[in-house]
């Protein structure tokens, strides 16, 4: 009866852990569509990969089939996440992630396994140490998403804090706590107590900052002011580009009306636009000749 209950709880734990593993899928689909990692961080996924690797090693030592199956899937999926992240991360973030993976997921994991296999001869002692190390990094998995709390508080937005990851981590922590309790495996039960607390803290943070309209009133006001300034600039540009716009002046308008009503004279054309400013050759007729002089008359 107890074994059946343990197996049932373990199955539920595997299902919830699988949902935890799949929770970042929308995040990486967004990364793929936008071809950019934006402000997402790789630390939670690198830590999750290391935790899955350590629990996989622990499951091999204890011959725990349920832990073995779910952590094998976890290693595969977390590796795919990091691969997608590296493909679309900017140069600086990509370099940091590569260093992190090489130092933590390769060098550190290899050092732990080599030390336990070569230096610890007793199997029970090896299992105890492997369980303690796995429990420590399980806590790191729960804490890792909290690295973006500062960003959430500063921006007053939970856009880059996956809600479903925190939600399923909380449920998974509850189930795995009872699994470890029933199995009397305190390396499994203990970290999930703090995991539950960290998960609840993340969900509370999500509730507080989930309303972007309420929490970004200042940002929206600033954006509205920028739009207003932009509209004014566009209006000013349109006025400057208009060919016949003048300041509003009553006297000037009246003078313009009088000038428009005045008849056209040679000295002043009716419309300045009608003036042809090109050179004009005018033929001036010669002046009239004076009448011929009368012959002189002699007087007798």
Swiss-Prot record:
What Gene Ontology molecular-function terms does this entry list? sugar transmembrane transporter activity
Q: Which compartment or compartments is the protein found in?
A: Cell membrane
Q: Where is the MtN3/slv domain?
A: 8-92, 131-213
Transmembrane ranges, per UniProt, are 5-25, 39-61, 68-88, 100-120, 129-149, 163-183, 186-206
Keyword Transmembrane belongs to the record: yes
Primary location group: membrane
Ranges in the topological domain labelled Cytoplasmic: 26-38, 89-99, 150-162, 207-300
**By its UniProt entry, which Gene3D superfamilies does this protein fall under?**
1.20.1280.290
Pro residues bias spans: 284-294
Keywords from the UniProt entry: Cell membrane, Membrane, Repeat, Sugar transport, Transmembrane, Transmembrane helix, Transport
Kindly give the membrane topology term recorded for this protein.
Multi-pass membrane protein
Q: What induces it?
A: By the X.oryzae pv. oryzae (Xoo) transcription activator-like effector (TALe) proteins (artificial TAL effectors).
Q: Where is the signal peptide?
A: none
Q: Name one GO cellular component term.
A: membrane
Biological process per Gene Ontology, one example term? carbohydrate transport
Q: Where is this region: Disordered?
A: 256-300
Q: Which Pfam families match?
A: MtN3_slv
List residues in topological domain: Extracellular. 1-4, 62-67, 121-128, 184-185
Q: Where is the composition biased (Basic and acidic residues)?
A: 269-280
Keyword Transmembrane attributed: yes
Question: What is the annotated quaternary arrangement, including any partners?
Answer: Forms homooligomers and/or heterooligomers.
Q: What is the documented function of this protein? A: Mediates both low-affinity uptake and efflux of sugar across the plasma membrane.
Q: Which family does it belong to?
A: Belongs to the SWEET sugar transporter family.
Q: What is this protein called?
A: Bidirectional sugar transporter SWEET12
- Name the gene for this chain: SWEET12
């Amino acid at each position: 009866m107890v074994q059946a209950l343990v197996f049932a709880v373990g199955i539920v734990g595997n299902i919830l852990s699988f949902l935890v593993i799949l929770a970042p899928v929308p995040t990486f689909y967004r990364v793929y569509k936008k071809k950019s990692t934006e402000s997402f961080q790789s630390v939670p996924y690198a830590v999750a990969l290391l935790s899955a690797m350590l629990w996989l090693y622990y499951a091999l030592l204890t011959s725990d089939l349920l832990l073995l199956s779910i952590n094998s899937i976890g290693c595969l999926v977390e590796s795919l996440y990091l691969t997608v992240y590296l493909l679309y991360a900017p140069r600086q973030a990509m370099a940091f992630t590569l260093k992190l993976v090489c130092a933590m997921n390769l060098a550190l994991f290899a050092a732990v396994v080599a030390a336990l296999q070569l230096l610890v001869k007793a199997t029970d002692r090896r299992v105890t140490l492997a369980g303690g190390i796995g429990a420590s990094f399980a806590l790191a998995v729960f804490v890792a998403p909290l690295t973006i709390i500062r960003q959430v508080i500063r921006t007053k937005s939970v856009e880059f804090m996956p809600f479903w990851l925190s939600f399923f981590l909380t449920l998974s922590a509850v189930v795995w706590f009872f699994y470890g309790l029933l199995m009397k495996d305190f390396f499994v039960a203990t970290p999930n107590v703090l995991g539950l607390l960290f998960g609840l803290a993340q969900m509370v943070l999500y509730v507080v900052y989930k309303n972007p309209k309420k929490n970004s009133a200042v940002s929206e006001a600033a954006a509205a002011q920028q739009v207003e300034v932009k509209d004014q600039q566009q209006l000013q540009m349109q006025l400057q580009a208009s060919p016949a716009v003048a300041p509003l002046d009553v006297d000037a308008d009246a003078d313009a009306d009088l000038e428009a009503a005045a008849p056209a004279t040679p000295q002043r054309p009716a419309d300045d636009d009608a003036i042809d400013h090109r050179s004009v050759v005018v033929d001036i007729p010669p002046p009239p000749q004076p009448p011929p002089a009368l012959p002189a008359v002699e007087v007798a």
